[in-house]
Curated annotation (Swiss-Prot):
This is Lipoprotein NlpI. The gene is nlpI. A lipid is attached at C19 (S-diacylglycerol cysteine). Residues 1-18 form the signal peptide. A lipid is attached at C19 (N-palmitoyl cysteine).
């Protein structure tokens, strides 16, 4: 009897596990993680050939190194990207876009003072480079300089009030100063916006207008292909992670930040700072670095 009972127990457990897994697959919204495309690989090979075989002017070489660095960055190859950016800057030290990328990497590494200097250099070289306000604002946010972060993120928001992610980052900064006032400002921004971009659904969730389930249903309905689904998931899981973190639920936040990273949308702000959030939550840096290079 004992072997028979043991077999029944195992069969029951497998059946229950199968039901559980089926239920999980039906309820979760998942995308195939983004992979390098053939076009990207061909472009990289062509860039390598040009850099190795052609006589380029300094300006041409610096620009090509920058463009290859951007492509490396989009593939999650940050060490190679940093190397190209550093080489480009050594040739042409007046490239604001290079300082911008280096500032982002310094922020991700937690080297906030150096990041501030990099973004200051961007704005000194090109005062109209508005994304430096976003990236410096994020660095100031993680560096604990909340009022300065608010100033930069407000400037970035004012440049395009119909971009929901500008409102979300401003809210995250203002939440640390006055949570009630921050939510009221977010509500005003939502009401004034044209609401055309999908990200306003995340704002609606933050305002309590819709449930998390409704948010995910809208996400799935809005995605036109796997790429847009992966991008929306990277964004949504990051801001859901920040939401749960604000409630003190670090376990849910950790899981959501990992999901944000899992889509391999390497050049999205949400992917970049999900890695930093995981680091701040005590995740192993070597594991995070390895996952980001895959």
């Amino acid at each position: 009897m004992k072997p028979f009972l043991r077999w029944c127990f195992v069969a029951t457990a497998l059946t229950l596990a199968g039901c559980s897994n089926t239920s999980w697959r039906k309820s979760e919204v998942l995308a195939v993680p983004l992979q390098p495309t053939l076009q990207q690989e061909v472009i990289l090979a062509r860039m390598e050939q040009i850099l190795a075989s052609r006589a380029l002017t300094d300006d041409e070489r610096a620009q090509l190194l920058y463009e290859r660095g951007v492509l490396y960055d989009s593939l999650g190859l940050r060490a190679l990207a940093r190397n190209d950016f550093s080489q480009a800057l050594a040739i042409r030290p007046d490239m604001p876009e290079v300082f911008n990328y280096l500032g982002i990497y310094l922020t991700q590494a937690g080297n906030f003072d150096a990041a501030y200097e990099a973004f200051d250099s961007v704005l000194e070289l090109d005062p109209t480079y508005n994304y430096a306000h976003l990236n410096r604002g994020i660095a100031l946010y993680y560096g604990g300089r909340d009022k300065l972060a608010q100033d930069d993120l407000l400037a970035f928001y004012q440049d395009d009030p119909n971009d929901p992610f500008r409102s979300l980052w401003l809210y995250l900064a203002e939440q640390k100063l006055d949570e009630k006032q921050a939510k009221e400002v977010l509500k005003q921004h939502f009401e004034k916006s044209d609401k055309e971009q999908w990200g306003w659904n995340i704002v609606e969730f933050y305002l309590g207008n819709i449930s998390e389930q409704t948010l995910m249903e809208r996400l799935k309905a809005d995605a036109t292909d796997n790429t847009s689904l992966a991008e929306h998931l990277s964004e949504t899981n990051f801001y859901l992670g920040k939401y749960y973190l604000s409630l003190g639920d670090s376990d849910s936040a950790t899981a959501l930040f990992k999901l944000a990273v899992a889509n391999n949308v390497h050049n999205f702000v949400e992917h970049r700072y999900a890695l930093l959030e995981l680091s701040l939550l005590g995740q192993d840096q070597d594991d995070l670095a390895e996952s980001d290079q895959q």
